[in-house]
């Protein structure tokens, strides 16, 4: 694996010179191998090690290099044709392969090669980009987008129209992460490497980036780039120091544990916020 990483790191340093026409065989094979390992879930761009999320930057670099070494090609779809550098994940799947993998894909859901989809996942008409990791039991609802290299945990619900930001465009240092057992409400956006920690509930229409203030109304504390575990979050505003205007923020209205979440439905958690 170290040899593979060294090839990727070296090639990335001269990425501006690389084109589909001049990419050498060693680099091409290394990049293709990494994409295949990401596709199978054997490797992932970010993983939790000793309680901390660690981003493997060299894997992200391999994803970026794949756009340098591959030319656009015609890609067949069920109702249409496409012209892109990245093949579709399910292009060669037959019924036996789908049965073996154990997830559902509802047309016209689109998943790029290099994204991993775990068992018991349901993909409604949605989009999952290259390098993403979607873990077991997760629902990616209609028109939701899982951005490049984003990490989605187990038993997560991404509601209709949710956007989970990627790392490729614009280029971000770390992927956006949604940990296990989270609920992200319809049309919400979580981007720029924000981490939503385990068991959190994000209401409909909440937008969180690295500069978004995440205000805990019980403690008065303000977080940036991280939603603490078990938070129930709604959109809100905080007043300016001079009181003349207010600016958007996300508000943590309560904290819940797994026991409470097991007894109370998501809608009930969001209704009782007073």
From Swiss-Prot:
Predominant cellular place of this UniProt entry's protein: cytoplasm
Enzyme class: transferase
UniProt catalytic activity: (S)-2,3,4,5-tetrahydrodipicolinate + succinyl-CoA + H2O = (S)-2-succinylamino-6-oxoheptanedioate + CoA
Activity regulation: Inhibited by N-ethylmaleimide, p-chloromercuriphenyl sulfonate, cobalt and copper ions.
GO biological process: diaminopimelate biosynthetic process; lysine biosynthetic process; lysine biosynthetic process via diaminopimelate
Keyword Amino-acid biosynthesis appears in the UniProt entry: yes
InterPro entries in the cross-refs: DapD_Trfase_Hexpep_rpt_fam (IPR005664), Hexapep (IPR001451), Hexapep_transf_CS (IPR018357), THP_succinylTrfase_dom1 (IPR023180), THP_succinylTrfase_N_sf (IPR037133), Trimer_LpxA-like_sf (IPR011004)
EC numbers for this chain: 2.3.1.117
Keyword Cytoplasm part of the UniProt annotation: yes
Pfam families, per database record: Hexapep_2 (PF14602), THDPS_N_2 (PF14805)
Pathway: Amino-acid biosynthesis; L-lysine biosynthesis via DAP pathway; LL-2,6-diaminopimelate from (S)-tetrahydrodipicolinate (succinylase route): step 1/3
UniProt subunit comment: Was originally thought to be a homodimer, but is rather a homotrimer as shown in orthologs.
Entry function: Catalyzes the formation of N-succinyl-2-amino-6-oxo-L-pimelate from succinyl-CoA and tetrahydrodipicolinate, a key step in lysine biosynthesis via diaminopimelate pathway.
Protein name from the UniProt record: 2,3,4,5-tetrahydropyridine-2,6-dicarboxylate N-succinyltransferase
Gene: dapD
């Amino acid at each position: 694996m170290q040899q593979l990483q060294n090839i990727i790191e070296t090639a990335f340093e001269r990425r501006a010179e690389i084109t589909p026409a001049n990419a050498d065989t060693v680099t091409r094979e290394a990049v293709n191998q990494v994409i295949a390992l990401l596709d199978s879930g054997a490797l992932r761009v970010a993983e939790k090690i000793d309680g901390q999320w660690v981003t493997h930057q060299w894997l992200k670099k391999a994803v970026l290099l794949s756009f340098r070494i591959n030319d656009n090609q015609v890609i067949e779809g069920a109702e249409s044709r496409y012209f892109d550098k990245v093949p579709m994940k399910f292009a060669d799947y037959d019924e036996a392969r789908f049965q073996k993998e154990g997830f559902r894909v509802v047309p016209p859901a689109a998943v790029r090669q290099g994204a991993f989809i775990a068992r018991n996942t349901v993909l409604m008409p949605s989009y999952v980009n290259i390098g993403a990791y979607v873990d077991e039991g997760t629902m990616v609802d209609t028109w939701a987008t899982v951005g490049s290299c984003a990490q989605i945990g187990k038993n997560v619900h991404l509601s209709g129209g949710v956007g989970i930001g990627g790392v490729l465009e614009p280029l971000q240092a770390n992927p956006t992460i949604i940990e296990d057992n989270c609920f992200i409400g319809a049309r919400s956006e979580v981007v720029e490497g924000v981490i939503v920690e385990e068991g959190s509930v994000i209401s409909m229409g909440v937008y969180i980036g690295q500069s978004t203030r995440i205000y805990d109304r019980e403690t008065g504390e303000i977080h940036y780039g991280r939603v603490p575990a078990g938070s129930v979050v709604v959109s809100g505003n905080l007043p300016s120091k001079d009181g003349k205007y207010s600016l958007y923020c996300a508000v943590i209205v309560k904290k819940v544990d797994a026991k409470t979440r097991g007894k109370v439905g998501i809608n009930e958690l969001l209704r009782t916020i007073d």
